[in-house]
């Protein structure tokens, strides 16, 4: 890296540059950077030396910028609607809030085994019980499980709780929040991802778990079903196996079976179902929410 003083001018080819009158070396590079024309293509090196990836691949640098814009937008939206940001414990004596395997550690001074949290849910609920009616946390979770394009042992999640709101209120709220995040991040509500245009501007599609399963799974066999499995779990398996990947545009899936939603409130119109939704975009689950079961 060098510091240059001089006067701007254009070359014979019209390129804007600087006629240097003074330069100072600010720092040396002891190792040569990858070829700027071909970039850094080795995936192992890109993941393990992300700083080099940022130098030579502008699109990766832009992803960091977009992530910062997105998280800032989410925070502004929540705080504009009277949500308070909190931080809950990372080290917990008991883990909960999700079905996942935790990382374990040991506190030497207390001679106590602890777990890195897998979710902030239980502590956020305690804050609601304590009188904070709108709280959220955007922070790290840790799950000692496999690695894939959709799963990482360390990841950031946004979790919020709104006392006295229904899951239908949360659907409307989440739709507006994500639409605003797309605009603040990309300058418009329509974004292109992996060659597909995703439209956050139009109303999100809504269909029930049963409707999705009937649309894409009816008449098709599912392997791995245990004898005596409940109707609700079979419906969920059919949805996950056949329907999930078909949900490309932003879509709320509602009315999940009671058997696969133990902490959600039963629907008053059908006690076999619950007041719950999941949001899907490009075949991936982005959100899971429900009206809490507060009278078991």
Predicted region positions:
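Metal-assisted phosphate- and nucleotidyl-transfer catalytic regions
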Residues: 96-102, 180-284, 291
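Conserved hydrophobic/aromatic pocket- or pore-lining residues that grip, position, or stack substrates
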Residues: 23, 78, 82, 212, ...
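Alpha-helical structural motif
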Residues: 70, 120, 131-134, 170, ...
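TRNA-recognition modules of translation machinery and tRNA-sensing kinases, especially anticodon-binding
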Residues: 116-119, 130, 134-141, 152-157, ...
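Class II aminoacyl-tRNA synthetase-like tRNA-binding/catalytic domains
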Residues: 1-169, 179, 224, 261
